[in-house]
Amino acid sequence: MLAYSVTSSGLFPRMLWALLLLAASLNAHNDVWDEPCCTEHEVSVNRGSRVVMACNISNNLRDVTIELVTSEKTSIIFNHTPPGNYSKDSWQLHIQGVQAQLVITDAQDKHSGNYSWKLHGFQAEFKNFNLTVNAADRQKTEDLPVTKVPDKPPTAVRTEVIIIIAIATTIIITGIGVFVWYKQFPVAPQIQMSVPCLIHGSPGIPYLTLPP
C-alpha cells in the first residue's frame, strides 16, 4: 500500500511537467518569427515624385515607429503608432494587418535622409530606408522658355534683293548681246568644190574652198 502511494505521488508531477512542456512547445510553434520583407532600401526620386516605402511581416503588426535621420538632426515622425491610417505634415502612414506603408505624395528636399523603422509584431524588427530627392533632370515641355528667332534686319533683306536683281540683269544682258551678235555676224558655211584639171585626191593638192 505504501509502495503504491509513493508511485502514484511520483507519477503525477511527471505528467504535469510533461503537459507544461507540451503547452510551451505549442505556444513557441505558433509564435513564428516576424521575418519582414520590405521594398528597396535605396530610393532615389526627382523632386515632386510620389514615394512609397513598405514592409510586410509574418505576424500582425502591433505598432510602428519611424524616425528620419539627417546630417542635421533626428526627427521622430511616428512613434509606437498602432494599426490605422495617419498623416503628419507631408507623411502618410498606413498600418493594416501585416503591412505598413509610408507614403510621400510630393517629395521635396526636406524628405531626404535615412528612415529608421521599428516594426513590432511578435518581435521587434529594425529596417532602414535611404531616400534621396534630386532636382528634376529636365523641365517639362510646357515649362521650357520659348526663344523667338529674330527677323532679318531690313538692310540685310535689301542687300539680298539687290544682289539677286543684279545677277538676273547680267544674265539677261549677256543673252541679248549674244543674240544680236549672232544676227549681225552669222557664221558663213563653207563649200568645197574641186578645181578642173586637178586630180581628185592627189597628194599635196587640196580642195579649193570658196565662199558662197
Curated annotation (Swiss-Prot):
Which sites does the entry annotate for glycosylation? 56, 85, 114, 130
* Disulfide bonds listed in the record: 38-55
GO terms for biological process?
Answer: immune response
Has keyword Cell membrane? yes
Gene3D superfamilies xref list: Immunoglobulins
Q: Which UniProt keywords apply?
A: Cell membrane, Disulfide bond, Glycoprotein, Membrane, Secreted, Signal, Transmembrane, Transmembrane helix
Topology check: give the Cytoplasmic ranges.
182-212
Record localization: Cell membrane; Secreted
How does the UniProt record describe the way this protein sits in the membrane? Single-pass type I membrane protein
Q: Which GO terms describe its molecular function?
A: cytokine activity
Extracellular compartment segments = 29-160
Q: Which GO terms describe its cellular component?
A: extracellular region; plasma membrane
On whether Transmembrane is a keyword of this UniProt record, the answer is yes
Q: Which InterPro entries match?
A: Ig-like_fold, SECTM1
In which broad location class does this protein mainly occur, judging by the first location in its UniProt entry? membrane
Extract the signal peptide range: 1-28
Q: Where are the transmembrane segments?
A: 161-181
Family named by the database record? Belongs to the SECTM family.
Q: Describe the subunit structure.
A: Interacts with CD7.
What does this gene product do?
May be involved in thymocyte signaling.
Q: What is this protein called?
A: Secreted and transmembrane protein 1b
**Where does this protein come from, organism-wise?**
Mus musculus (Mouse)
**Upper lineage:** Eukaryota, Metazoa, Chordata, Craniata, Vertebrata
- Which gene carries the instructions for this protein? Sectm1b
